[in-house]
């Protein structure tokens, strides 16, 4: 018998680290002029139309088995991984689908790109939900559609955040895939075999958002753009780092050191972003990960306090110094002198 997961308690447990649903200023996006690099969009659109993964997400016989042999804690952590991944993919589907609908008259090229990206995200979410079904559970995507809460971002911020989200998704998937190709004994479930082609969807989506950013030079070329790029790089990296610090046991179960994994993903994503953003973070500065480690410890302590049976007022007093320390460490990271990536935009990596 399959149990449907509706996440009715989500509003009570939602944090800054929870996958979110976004909306934006559709009129501003509709008025964008993409003539600066229109040929790039035609090339990307042809890539999307080719639909290289149309036959990739097909479940084979290897899925038709019992997963009761998985250790209980590992199974629980893996299901949570599937749920979070499915929610994130579904969030992307809803945003891209709405953008394609709103832009189809004013900017048909961009609208079709969003439509085809929504196809990919829906495919990913459906594949993940089928995997959840192997554990007699199902994420209620219809319920999510009806009850989702939107976070508003202006188009510029949507571009920064989603570009980084797609690129970091690429590096997360390909890093896990390569690890499991080398150590197949850690492949606890066949979905990991799909990550090589899967991550190429993420990479193409990231390239699309890179083209959008380049089509609007003012999103990249002034001092405010540099400040915002630093902010979004730090936000995306810190969110992943703090999330994964809570899930060390899951990464251990698939043979990965979560800290080393995150460091690799952050370095690679930072390198990718340096080809688009005017600045990159100095992730090789020893203080960078030192401060991130402190943030992760602060966040873990905050979670531990929430698990205690103390009175709300007592918890508030216990949390206050931890929040202050976490915020201070994030500010310290932000203030580390960034790398001027504009100076190396023509460097071949």
Curated annotation (Swiss-Prot):
Q: Does the keyword Lipoprotein apply?
A: no
MF terms in GO: iron ion binding; magnesium-protoporphyrin IX monomethyl ester (oxidative) cyclase activity
Supply the Pfam families for this chain: Rubrerythrin (PF02915)
Q: Which reaction does it catalyse?
A: Mg-protoporphyrin IX 13-monomethyl ester + 3 NADPH + 3 O2 + 2 H(+) = 3,8-divinyl protochlorophyllide a + 3 NADP(+) + 5 H2O
- What are the subcellular locations of this protein? Plastid, Chloroplast
The record, for NCBIfam families, names: AcsF (TIGR02029), PRK13654.1 (NF010172)
Q: What is this protein called?
A: Magnesium-protoporphyrin IX monomethyl ester [oxidative] cyclase
Q: Which organism is it from?
A: Porphyra purpurea
């Amino acid at each position: 018998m399959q149990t449907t997961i509706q996440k009715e308690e989500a509003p009570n447990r939602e944090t800054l680290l929870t996958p979110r649903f976004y909306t934006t200023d559709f009129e501003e996006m509709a008025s964008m002029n993409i003539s600066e690099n229109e040929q790039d969009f035609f090339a990307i659109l042809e890539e999307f139309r080719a639909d290289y993964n149309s036959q990739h997400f097909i479940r084979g016989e290897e899925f038709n088995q019992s997963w009761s042999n998985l250790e209980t804690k590992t199974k629980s952590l893996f299901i949570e991984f599937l749920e979070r991944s499915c929610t994130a993919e579904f969030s992307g589907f809803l945003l891209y689908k709405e953008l394609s609908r709103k832009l189809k008259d004013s900017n048909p090229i961009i609208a079709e790109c969003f439509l085809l990206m929504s196809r990919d995200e829906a495919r990913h979410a459906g594949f993940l939900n089928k995997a959840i079904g192997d554990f007699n559970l199902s994420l209620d995507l219809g319920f999510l559609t009806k009850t989702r809460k939107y976070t508003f971002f202006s188009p510029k911020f949507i571009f920064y955040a989603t570009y980084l989200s797609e690129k970091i998704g690429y590096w997360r998937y390909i890093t896990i895939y390569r690890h499991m190709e080398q150590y197949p004994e850690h492949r606890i479930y066949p979905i990991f075999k799909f990550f090589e082609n899967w991550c190429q969807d993420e990479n193409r989506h990231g390239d699309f958002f890179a083209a959008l950013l380049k089509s609007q030079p003012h999103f990249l070329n002034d001092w405010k753009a540099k400040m915002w790029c630093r902010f979004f790089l730090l936000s995306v990296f810190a969110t992943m780092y703090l999330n994964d610090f809570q899930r060390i046991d899951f990464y251990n179960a698939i043979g990965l050191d979560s800290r080393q994994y995150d460091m690799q993903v952050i370095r690679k994503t930072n390198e990718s972003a340096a080809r688009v953003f005017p600045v990159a973070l100095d992730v090789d500065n020893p203080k960078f990960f030192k401060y991130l480690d402190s943030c992760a410890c602060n966040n873990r302590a905050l979670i531990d306090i929430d698990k205690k049976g103390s009175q709300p007022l007592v918890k508030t007093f216990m949390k206050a110094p931890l929040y202050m320390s976490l915020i201070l460490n994030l500010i310290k990271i932000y203030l580390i002198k960034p790398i001027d990536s504009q100076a190396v935009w023509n460097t071949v990596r």
